[in-house]
């Protein structure tokens, strides 16, 4: 792997005796890993568990496998898994993932929340926010909204609101060079300084949203001191209410430069790619805040259609605020402020759509619910799964009463479909379809 001369000089000076091992690590294959999803009812025994993190396993997963399609597994390399683990938000808390795409850290945070509390998952880039929505929907979480806006606009709505803020900042990406060698072409001597300033600009607004007594997790996938310890020093200098919290150094982690409380991950020490993580605690006394919540905007007919569907097909009562956007029905987490001035990419859990005096359940609802929460479900075989994901109707071995059924693959929800006799009509979203 070829590096710019300035990069070589920089890390020879920074790492000294370790520099040779550091550069040699780039000739080794990038480490692949994934996480399992604890929100899913049916779990499996996967091999090669990562000792440092819950739900983590070494290895590769196929994006066309049933485990991936049902949201049971999510691909994420080991070092990146450390960020949400450092955050480890408590159940029922309010969490912000400030720069969230493609969704690895958000889905990991949702694992800790366990369908309680609230996650606001923000991504300013519209194309990347669509990928974020897709990944969160597949994960099956109910307590998350996805926003597509800037930190300054979010701060006007969520001032002093979040118990945990995770900011995995846009960075020079040095830690991903082994995984994505093409990224090297963007690196130049001043690039880390340029990115460090961007990180500070975003944090200037982002920190306004941290509640008294809350925690900030700042991370990057680079080793640049300008973007890491330099930003940590800036945070402490400009935010006297924040103090660093020591991160336990798990196998292969290193202390940060000048800030031993922070953590660095190098590929010649840690079995993974590159990462930096810092944890801050707000010293202010936590306050009880009251949020003026919105009200359901369903009309009488829509309310009746939803209640009829829920009574007939669901065994559980879904907790949250029902809101209609166009003809689409969403379930929003409780405790949200007015979001009318925020660009939203996903308004909570999409329940379905109203069509000509009937209600059709969404794929998102069917993948979020467990089989214990629905009245009727049908387990697809692997051959039937292959037919369904390619957009075909599926023929069952026996007939069923006509109506809506939750589809299951290996016991986990895979959307709703309408069954007529022994035929499963295809309701798998066209944008997700693929051929096996």
Question: Where do the language-model regions lie?
Answer:
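Polybasic, low-complexity RNA-engagement segments
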Residues: 1-14, 18-41, 273-276, 283-436
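A short acidic, Gly/Pro-enriched loop at the edge of an enzyme's catalytic core
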Residues: 90-91, 155-166
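Conserved class I S-adenosyl-L-methionine
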Residues: 92-101
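Conserved SAM-binding loop of SAM-dependent methyltransferases across substrates and taxa
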Residues: 102-115
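Helix-to-beta-strand junctions that scaffold the AdoMet/dcAdoMet cofactor pocket
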Residues: 114, 210-212
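S-adenosyl-L-methionine
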Residues: 124-159
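Mobile active-site "lid"/loop adjacent to the S-adenosyl-L-methionine
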Residues: 127, 163-202, 221-228, 250
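Class I S-adenosyl-L-methionine
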Residues: 162, 215-218, 223-330
């Amino acid at each position: 792997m070829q590096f710019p001369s300035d990069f070589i000089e920089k890390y020879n000076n920074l790492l000294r005796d370790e520099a040779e091992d550091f550069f040699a690590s780039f000739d080794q294959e990038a480490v692949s890993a994934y996480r399992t999803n604890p929100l899913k009812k049916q779990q499996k025994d996967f091999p090669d568990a990562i000792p440092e993190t819950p739900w983590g396993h070494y290895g590769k997963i196929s994006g066309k496998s049933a485990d991936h399609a049902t949201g049971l597994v999510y691909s994420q390399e080991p070092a990146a898994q450390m960020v949400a683990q450092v955050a480890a938000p408590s159940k029922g808390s309010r969490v912000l993932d400030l720069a969230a795409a493609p969704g690895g850290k958000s889905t990991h945070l949702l694992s800790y929340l366990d369908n309680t509390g609230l996650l606001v998952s923000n991504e300013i880039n519209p194309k990347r926010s669509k990928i974020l929505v897709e990944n969160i929907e597949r994960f099956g979480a109910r307590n998350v909204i996805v926003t597509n806006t800037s930190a300054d606009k979010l701060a006007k709505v969520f001032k002093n609101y979040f118990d945990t803020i995770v900011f995995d900042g846009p960075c020079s990406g040095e830690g991903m060079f082994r995984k994505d060698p093409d990224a090297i072409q963007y690196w130049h001597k001043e690039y880390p300084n340029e990115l460090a300033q961007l990180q500070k600009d975003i944090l200037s607004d982002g920190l306004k949203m941290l509640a008294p007594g809350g925690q900030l997790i700042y991370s990057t996938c680079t080793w640049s001191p300008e973007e890491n310890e330099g930003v940590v020093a800036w945070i402490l200098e400009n935010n006297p209410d924040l103090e660093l919290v020591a991160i336990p150094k798990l196998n292969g982690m290193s202390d940060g430069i000048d800030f031993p409380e922070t953590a660095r991950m190098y590929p010649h020490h840690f079995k993974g790619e590159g990462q930096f993580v810092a944890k801050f605690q707000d010293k202010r006394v936590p306050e009880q805040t009251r949020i003026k919540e919105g009200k359901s905007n369903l009309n009488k007919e829509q309310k009746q259609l939803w209640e009829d569907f829920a009574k007939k097909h669901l065994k559980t009562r879904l907790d949250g605020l029902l809101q209609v956007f166009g003809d689409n029905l969403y379930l929003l987490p409780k405790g949200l402020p007015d979001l009318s001035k925020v660009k939203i990419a996903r308004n909570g859990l999409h329940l379905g759509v109203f069509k000509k005096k009937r209600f059709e359940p969404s794929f998102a609802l069917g993948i979020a619910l467990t089989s214990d929460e629905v009245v009727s479900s049908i387990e697809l075989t692997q051959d039937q799964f292959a037919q369904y994901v390619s957009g075909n109707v599926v023929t069952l071995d026996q007939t069923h009463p006509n109506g809506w059924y939750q589809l299951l693959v290996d016991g986990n929800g895979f959307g709703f479909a309408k069954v007529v006799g022994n035929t499963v009509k295809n309701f798998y979203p066209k944008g997700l379809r693929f051929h096996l």
